[in-house]
Amino acid sequence: MTALTPSATRRVRRFTEQRWLLDAVIQTVGLEWDQGRIGYSMAPCGVLAAPDFERVRSRVKKFDDIAREFAEVGVARIRRAEAARQAGHEASEREHNFIASILFGQAQWPIFENTEENQRLESLKNAAYAAYARVAGHPVRQVELRGAAGPCPVGCICRPAPARTSRWGA
């Protein structure tokens, strides 16, 4: 899967021209070439997620591999959550769905546009988190922050996007 569409590629010329260098660094150093991505992503999931993140780490050889590999392990976690649900193992179902939501979120970060693939991953992430919330054992509610003209605009290098927050407790 290509992380950039042709229109995005034209807008980010330097990234496109130097992509070979980033791919060489990832091939040499691995997925954590610039930051402790695996560590901070896995932290809320706990040690049970370590095999998933290690699989991604071992299989990513270039930038375009990142979204695909995270999505694949996310789908596998969804399957495990469904099997746990059918077997009546609520705690396992909860863990698998939470981990899947994190994995799908990680699959989204190297996609720089609102493509069909990014929207698919967003839907999978939200569905997994909603499934987690159903059996969380504590209140989990979706809250939308509205601005004057719709969702509260936030963003970084991209266009504004709806804000999502989480808060423990009441």
Locate each region found by the language model.
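Flexible helix-coil transition and linker loops at the boundaries of alpha-helical arrays
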Residues: 86-90, 132-135
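Phosphate-binding active sites in nucleotide-utilizing proteins
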Residues: 164-170
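Short amphipathic alpha-helical heptad-repeat segments
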Residues: 70-74, 97
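Short, charge-rich amphipathic alpha-helical segments embedded
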Residues: 90, 94-120
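A structural signal for well-ordered alpha-helices, especially hydrophobic packing surfaces
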Residues: 78, 104-111, 129, 133
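N-terminal cap/lid segment of alpha/beta-hydrolase-fold proteins
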Residues: 70, 119-164
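Long, non-catalytic architectural segments outside compact domain cores
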Residues: 1-66
